[in-house]
C-alpha cells in the first residue's frame, strides 16, 4: 500500500484549484496527461486535456486519447468544436542560450514550479496565458472560423465562414446574426456564444504560431506533422492560391463555400492535418489563408502603439471607442493598455510589407517586459524581417493607423504571403471586408 501526503495544491499564481475529473497519479509525461501541451514533434503535441470544463463544454469521444483525431477537442452547447491549448513555457533560441538561432523549445505548464523559476532557466510563460491579472492554465480556441448557426457564430466543420461584409450570400455577414458589419463587430460575434467567450487575441494567435514553429523544428517526418517538409515549406498549409488550394502544396483541395468560387468551407481541406497548427487532425484549422481574422490586444492611436495589459479581463472588452472598456479610443487606451511608443522592433510605421523571418534573430527571448509581451503578440525584432522559409515568408504590413485592428493569417488568394505568422497592421476597427472573419476563444 502507498501513502499519499498532500499539504498544498495550488496553481503557480495561487488561484483556486478544483479537480472535477479527479487527479491522475503516475510517472507519465507528455501528451495524454492532464493540462500538458505535449512534446514538439510527437503525437498529440499542441493541444491537450483540460483539467476542468467551463459551463456548457463537454468532451468528445477521443478527447483524452492522444492518438485520436479529437484529442484535446471539446464541444459547446451550440455545437462548436474548440481546441484546448494548455499553458506552456518557451525558450526562443539565440544561438547562445542552449538553442540554435530561431529554434523554439516548449515545456509544459507543470515543468517549472513557478514563472520565476522558469525565467531563471531562460523560459517564459507565453503572454497568451495571462488574463484578468492572473495566470490561466489554458484557453479554448475555435477549431474553425465561425459560421452562421441561427443567431450564433459557431465553429463547425464545412461551414460558410462569416465575414465583416457580405460575400455573395445573405448568410455571410455579421449582420446576419445581429452583429455589426465591421472589424470591431467580432467582439459581439464572439459573445453570441455566451458571456465567457471573447474575440481571439493576437497573443492567442501568436501562441498557435509558436507551437507550429516548435513542432516544425522537432519533427523528422510527416507521421505526426502532416505538413512537414525537409526543405522549404515546413509550416501549416491552407486555402490561399485563389483556386481552393495552397500555393506551396498542390495536393491540397478545399470544397467551395458557394460564394466567390475560390473560398473554401471551413475545415474542408482533403488533408485536414496539413492545414492545422500541429499537423494533426486534432489541431486548429485554417490559420493559413481562407479568411483574414481580426484580433484584439495590439492597437494604435495613429502616433504610438499600445499593448493590452495582463491585468485586463478580455471578456469585459467592448467594441466601441469611448468607454474605459472599449478596445479602441483614448479612454480605453488609457484604462487598459500600455503605450510602447512610436516604434517597436520591426514595427516602424514604414507603410511597407515586411516578410517574416531572417538569418538573424526573429523574436525576442525576453522572459518579461515589453520585449516579452511583443514577442507574445508575434511582432518580430528589428532584425527579424527580410523573409525566411522557416517563417513561411509570411507578410507583416507595417502601418500605424488610429484604431488599428491587426488582421492575421491571410485570405483565399494571398498565396505565399499568407500564413500563421502573417499580420496586417494597416486596418482600422471600423472597416469591413468580405474576406475578414474571426474566431472565438474562452479562458479556463
Language-model features: locations:
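Acidic glycine-/aspartate-rich tracts in secreted/extracellular proteins
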Residues: 14, 88-91, 145-148, 204, ...
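GGW-centered surface loops in extracellular recognition modules
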Residues: 27-95
